[in-house]
Amino acid sequence: MLSVIICTYNRRKYIYNCLKSIAENDFDASKYEILVVNNNSTDDTEGECRRFGSDYPQINFSVCCETSQGLSYARNRGIEEAKGDILVYVDDDATVNREYLSTIAQFFDRYPDAMAAGGAIYPVYETEEPKWMSKYTRELITAYKDEGRRVIRMTGSRFPSGGNAAYRREIFDRVGRFDPALGRRGNLLISGEEKAVFYSMKRLDMPIYYLPSMILYHIIPQSKLTKQYFDNLTLSIGRSERLRTLSVSKAVFGKRLVAEGIKWIATIILGIGLTLRLSPEKAAKIFAFRRNVTRGLLGH
């Protein structure tokens, strides 16, 4: 059985369409459940969930409330409440394709070695994509992911986005739960909780795959395209990496600092290239990205 877990905080505008896209999948309703974990929403997210439950009575649908604020707390509550052996996390500001659930179910049946999987993520802008957006900042802002048209094992530093990921339940008994010190908390943009889980899995050589037909369409509002959001997000990425690596060891943190130096070299090369191609606004953004990540990594 699949358990589709949607952790939500103040997503009244998007949650109904998210749930609707799952319910309208070409998949037997008796083979999955949808579980919403409401993380102290103050808008009418709960009302939209009730509306969905009324409109789709055939769906095994439930809502629980996690009062400890934070995405990691909500995700961990989902593990506790879910009944399935495959746990699927879907972002609350997104929709999925009609083959989403069947793709996941068939994959885990065909790949008994697989312990987790993630899919493609395509942005859906509510306004135009800004001129400063490049392939280097698109993944950062929108969680864009496209690893090609084939099922592949994600090796090295590659891993799925936490908002479009499926896990065998048993992995959480082996690597532990999502770290509450990481992950979004209300409007705070700390992240990295799923990255910590995936790296723990890789240390145990637990296979993680990419599924091209597991598609999520991520809605990007204008509020995520502002300078304030960009600076807050990128600074939070650095802070998250500091927390994540120091929680493992000082040696791992030291390696991350060395990696940051290498990333600066790549950033300078990319920035020069973009400037020469007459895209100075794109170059400025990748420099701002690297600067903010470094500041967060150093504890600012």
Placement of each model-derived feature along the sequence:
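Short, well-formed alpha-helical segments that are part of the catalytic scaffolds
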Residues: 11-25
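Short aromatic/hydrophobic "clamp" motif used to bind/position activated sugar donors
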Residues: 87
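Short, flexible, basic/aromatic active-site loop/helix in glycosyltransferases
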Residues: 136-158
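A short, conserved alpha-helix in the catalytic core of glycosyltransferases
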Residues: 162-167, 171-176, 181-214
